[in-house]
Every structure is written in C-alpha cells, then in structure tokens.
Amino acid sequence: MSDLCPVYAPFFGSIGCAAAIVFTCFGASYGTAKSGVGICATSVTRPDLLVKNVVPVVMAGIIAIYGLVVSVLVSDSLSQKQALYTGFIQLGAGLSVGLSGLAAGFAIGIVGDAGVRGTAQQPRLFVGMILILIFAEVLGLYGLIVALLLNSRASQDVTC
C-alpha cells in the first residue's frame, strides 16, 4: 500500500454510497409524510381531490430514486485496492446527491402540505403548487447531476 492507495480508501467510497441513499430517503420520507398529512386532512372535506393531490407524494418519491442511482453507481465501482482520490470523489458524490435530496424533500413536503390544503379551498392554486414543486424537485436534480459528474471522474488517471 502506498500513500495514494491506503487500506482505508474504500471506506470513504462506502460512506459516500451510504450517504447518497440515506439522506435522499430521509428527504423523500419527510416529503411524503408532510404532504401525506395534508392530503389526509383535506380528503375528509374534499375526497374528489384525492388523486389530484397525490402529486407531491410522487415527486418526493422521485428524490429517493436519485440517491439510489448514485448509490448503485458508487457501490459498483468500489474495490479493495482503491486510490484515496477515488474514495474522496465517491464521498463527495454521495454527499452531493444526498444533501441536495434532503433539502429538496423538505421543500417538497412543506410546499406539498400547504399547497394541498390551499387547493382544497381554492382549486386555482393547484397550478402554482405544481410550479413550486417543480422548482423544489430541481434542487435534487442538481445534486444528481453533480454526483454523476463527480463519479465519472472517480477513476480517471488513478492506478494502485
């Protein structure tokens, strides 16, 4: 083992892999729970809006898929003999998609809850809610793009 390829280098890649799925699932579960509470509360008085108001829950679930994609890509490239550079890049990729997915899930949950409750009283608010949800979803997409770019550089010009 050299200084560039220590025995603990795969640890950082493993943490990146775990961070990608854990943080995005935290965000997705918060978004699902928060907007799900709003859907349940408004469906009592307006059951006709139930299917229409499921959009925030679906969008929150998509956030977890971003983390799954990066986690699978990082875990596929993990190896016992790995450069420290690769481990750090994989950690950065996992944190990138994970933390942006966490923030996006929080935003989707809060906007989804308020939007669903507002739509029950004024149906014209639905379009505005969808637009804001799209902007919140894009936050997670930015993290996915950065993670994919980082992961594509993880094994370039590195040998152990």
From Swiss-Prot:
Entry keywords, A to Z: Hydrogen ion transport, Ion transport, Membrane, Transmembrane, Transmembrane helix, Transport, Vacuole
Site positions per UniProt: Essential for proton translocation: 137
Any one cellular-component term (Gene Ontology): vacuolar proton-transporting V-type ATPase, V0 domain
Residue intervals passing through the bilayer: 7-27, 54-74, 91-111, 130-150
GO terms for biological process, alphabetical: endocytosis; intracellular copper ion homeostasis; intracellular iron ion homeostasis; protein targeting to vacuole; vacuolar acidification; vacuole organization
Cytoplasmic side: 28-53, 112-129
Lumenal side: 1-6, 75-90, 151-160
Protein localization: Vacuole membrane
Tree of life domain: Eukaryota
SUPFAM superfamilies in UniProt: F1F0 ATP synthase subunit C
InterPro entries: ATPase_proteolipid_c-like_dom (IPR002379), ATPase_proteolipid_csu (IPR000245), ATPase_proteolipid_su_C_euk (IPR011555), F/V-ATP_Csub_sf (IPR035921)
Pfam families: ATP-synt_C
Topology within the bilayer: Multi-pass membrane protein
GO terms assigned for molecular function: proton-transporting ATPase activity, rotational mechanism
Assembly mode: V-ATPase is a heteromultimeric enzyme composed of a peripheral catalytic V1 complex (components A to H) attached to an integral membrane V0 proton pore complex (components: a, c, c', c'', d, e, f and VOA1). The decameric c-ring forms the proton-conducting pore, and is composed of eight proteolipid subunits c, one subunit c' and one subunit c''.
Family: Belongs to the V-ATPase proteolipid subunit family.
Function as written in the Swiss-Prot or TrEMBL entry: Proton-conducting pore forming subunit of the V0 complex of vacuolar(H+)-ATPase (V-ATPase), a multisubunit enzyme composed of a peripheral complex (V1) that hydrolyzes ATP and a membrane integral complex (V0) that translocates protons. V-ATPase is responsible for acidifying and maintaining the pH of intracellular compartments.
PANTHER family linked: V-TYPE PROTON ATPASE PROTEOLIPID SUBUNIT
Name under which the protein is recorded: V-type proton ATPase subunit c
Organism: Candida tropicalis
Lineage per the UniProt record: Eukaryota, Fungi, Dikarya, Ascomycota, Saccharomycotina
Gene: VMA3
